[in-house]
């Protein structure tokens, strides 16, 4: 049985009775085939029993929680079954060694930038971006501090958003990237997709031997899986941004799917459902992998990226970020 993500939008109770997981809401009680669940995303007010959490932990199923506004709150991260002390030590050493950390941080930024360039060319708004990248890549290579790397990344992203705006319809311009709260519809859409993508990457990291809290571009900190932030730089342009662009240009997402709240703009529940339908379809789409010579889903590409990072950390093969060929 192919495992799938389960999204819970309605309020209710998630509990275990004997060896069956149930979700009960105002519409009734529904048994869930736990063997077919890969991970769970909770957007409603859901009470989860300790027995249900114990059952989910046994099955290795992460649960990601989002608040009323669609912002990521946190994850139930089951005890890891793929532990490797040797890899964790190597992962930490690459963080502690400034040169090794800089190599990886720069590669994440480079990969992200090249994927942004791919998007702009696809949308026919790439004027001047390639030349700008050449200049900023020179700055990137000469950077000696992570803060300098982050500064280059921020400038690349700013130029990217400015050009992307030229491809977007009126009423869905980014104008300026704003987050908490997003100040307009496009910012709300991008933030919502990025939040879901981050949680997806956390699930993929759970299924590897990598420690999700040891990262290189983003500073490791408490209360976040910072390695997921590193990997999200690669995938935001080619997953989240492409979905956002398609939804607004094809008129699938409309102004009515947003609401004003928190001095900003947020998706309605119906809007979230529309976006997540497109998101899940996108992750399930297959592309022909040039190295593996076979079709893999876009979600699988995230896991493969983590495996490439592992090979780099253990000295098998230098990491090269995914640059979209599709």
Swiss-Prot record:
Its EC number is 3.1.-.-. Signal peptide: none annotated. One of its GO terms (biological process) is defense response to virus. Keywords: Antiviral defense, DNA-binding, Endonuclease, Hydrolase, Magnesium, Manganese, Metal-binding, Nuclease. Gene3D superfamilies: CRISPR-associated endonuclease Cas1, C-terminal domain, CRISPR-associated endonuclease Cas1, N-terminal domain. CDD domains: Cas1_I-B. Pfam families: Cas_Cas1. Transmembrane segments: none annotated. Mn(2+) binds at residues 153, 218, 233. One of its GO terms (molecular function) is metal ion binding. Its cofactor is Mg(2+); Mn(2+). Homodimer, forms a heterotetramer with a Cas2 homodimer. CRISPR (clustered regularly interspaced short palindromic repeat), is an adaptive immune system that provides protection against mobile genetic elements (viruses, transposable elements and conjugative plasmids). CRISPR clusters contain spacers, sequences complementary to antecedent mobile elements, and target invading nucleic acids. CRISPR clusters are transcribed and processed into CRISPR RNA (crRNA). Acts as a dsDNA endonuclease. Involved in the integration of spacer DNA into the CRISPR cassette. Belongs to the CRISPR-associated endonuclease Cas1 family. This is CRISPR-associated endonuclease Cas1. It comes from Thermococcus kodakarensis (strain ATCC BAA-918 / JCM 12380 / KOD1). The lineage of its organism: Archaea, Methanobacteriati, Methanobacteriota, Thermococci, Thermococcales.
